[in-house]
């Protein structure tokens, strides 16, 4: 996995709609809600603006702009139209490697770390060995949205992201994100905003070719 491959994507893959749980809802039921929300959202495009500040050499700070594409069940793509090419080439890979909650049970060994009635913390261990040792995911029990993700790598590095949501056409979608990446020889802070959503456009699979 590319060193800048996972963090921000964090969670547009978790584009989730709000719904109130019944009292005492179990973590399993919460995950079911997370996996089945936004039932009418089949695809979208949106405008992405991102700021990346590298805290290690070469200490670049870059503003990027592009179009974000999503198509069910798990296709994600960012095509940048402006920004520093070197940074953009890394950044557009972020969104291609995030799996939605509907696939968590298939791809990870899943356990519940804690549930205080407001927030549930999950641990996801990949069933297939790769660079990620495990993922810590935090979900809001009321809205069934992924609020934070942290990828913990075998090399001792990590990437983390916090999601902030808004409403679009009756769906809850990511409006902004903040995050951080620390890996050997590479440290960066990330912030992004996503707006201009167009819901359920006809998207060709060719857009996602090569991902």
Please place each PLM-identified region on the residue numbering:
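Bacterial N-terminal signal peptides that target proteins for export
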Residues: 1-10
């Amino acid at each position: 996995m590319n060193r800048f491959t996972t963090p921000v994507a964090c969670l547009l893959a978790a584009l989730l709609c709000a719904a109130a749980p019944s009292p005492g809802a179990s973590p399993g039921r919460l995950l079911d809600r997370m996996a089945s929300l936004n039932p009418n959202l089949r695809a979208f495009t949106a405008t992405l603006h991102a700021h990346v500040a590298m805290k290690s050499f070469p200490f670049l700070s870059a503003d990027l702009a592009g179009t974000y594409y999503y198509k069910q069940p798990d296709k994600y793509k960012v095509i940048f139209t402006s920004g520093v090419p070197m940074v953009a080439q890394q950044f557009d890979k972020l969104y291609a490697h995030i799996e939605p909650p509907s696939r968590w049970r298939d791809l990870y060994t899943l356990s519940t770390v804690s549930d205080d009635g407001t927030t549930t913390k999950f641990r996801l261990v990949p069933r297939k060995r790769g660079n990620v040792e495990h993922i810590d995911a935090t979900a809001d029990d009321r809205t069934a949205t992924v609020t934070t993700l942290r990828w913990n790598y075998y090399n001792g590095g990590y990437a983390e992201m916090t999601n902030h949501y808004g409403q679009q056409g009756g769906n809850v979608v990511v409006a902004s994100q903040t995050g951080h990446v620390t890996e050997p020889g590479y440290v960066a802070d990330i912030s992004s905003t996503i707006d201009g959503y167009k819901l359920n456009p006809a998207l060709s699979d060719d857009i996602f070719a090569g991902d």
